[in-house]
Amino acid sequence: MGASAVTALNNITMRPFCFIVVLLSAFSCLFAGEPIRVLSINVRLSTANDGENNWSKRKEFMTDIIAAGNYDFIGTQETVMNPDPERNQVSYISSKLAGHGVFGRSREVSPEVGEAMTIFYKKERWNMDETDQTTFWLSDTPDVAGSKTDPKAGCPRSVTAALFHELKEGKPTGRKIYFYNTHLDHMSEEARQRGAKQLMDRIAARKNKDVPVIVTGDMNCGERSPAIRFMKGEPMTLDEKEWISPYKLTDSFRSANPDATDVGTFNGFKEPGKSKIDYIFVSPSLKTISAEIIRTQRDGRYPTDHFPIDAVIAW
């Protein structure tokens, strides 16, 4: 091959790399902070009888995927807290993420037994505000542990939320982010709509209204559902009344992949469905650099019954 051909080949090979460098450089000029890496994952509860896909047979694979991403924040759903260490998913995941703190409690009456919507955060970079953190229930009595209002709802649903202060070399930078993690109901459409409304009301009423928001969750409904459209700022009819969302979120995946059609996130340990029911939402002031549905397999098996999703966010 002649010198000119080699030069041409090198130019072609370098173009994608150069484009990525230019893109990241552009974001770094527009947004002063280091990007925020986020993962949302429904871990599939450890107490389920899943045969070959039982928790004991997939937990190492799943935590390998979580750890590999070097994430700032990880929102997990169906994360079991249990006195039995073999079933305690929060404890196991924590043991594999030594550099991360963890915040969350069970959605049931007992804070340490049941499924939790857990937030893992990188301790080197983030300090959780002890005065601005909460778990609330998606019910008419949000401060009552284990509460639910809709009789058609499958179980109590909760939201874990906290304000985080960014650190650099152990000192606050002055920059802050709110993080919310939830799991909407799988049985009742009305419960999902009420849950979405209550979540958006709480976000709009947060203490520091100028601080941007990240929301992770298994919403159990597709992109065109009333609950998701409401979270993105569209009106929703509930109780024969039209409600206007008090806050507007952006779907990070759609920001990065507006034309994607292969977007199913529930796989049932088999083949994925067509609907995207897992989300990472962000405030409009935050910009998505990249977002992905992680379909990694090991020996023909998935790490959980939902595909993990991640996003890299500029701020």
Sequence positions of predicted segments:
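Active-site environment of divalent metal-dependent phosphoester hydrolases
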Residues: S46-T47, M81-P85, E112, H186-S188, ...
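Sec-exported extracytoplasmic/periplasmic mature domains
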Residues: A67-Y71, Y92-A98, R125, D201-N208, ...
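Active-site neighborhood of phospho(di)ester-bond hydrolases with catalytic His/Asp-centered motifs
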Residues: G75-Q77, F103-S106, I214-D218, D251-S252
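Structured beta-strand-rich core segments of catalytic domains in phosphoester-bond hydrolases
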Residues: Q77-Y180, L184
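Metal-dependent phosphoester-hydrolase catalytic domains
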Residues: E190, R194, D201-V213, C221-W315
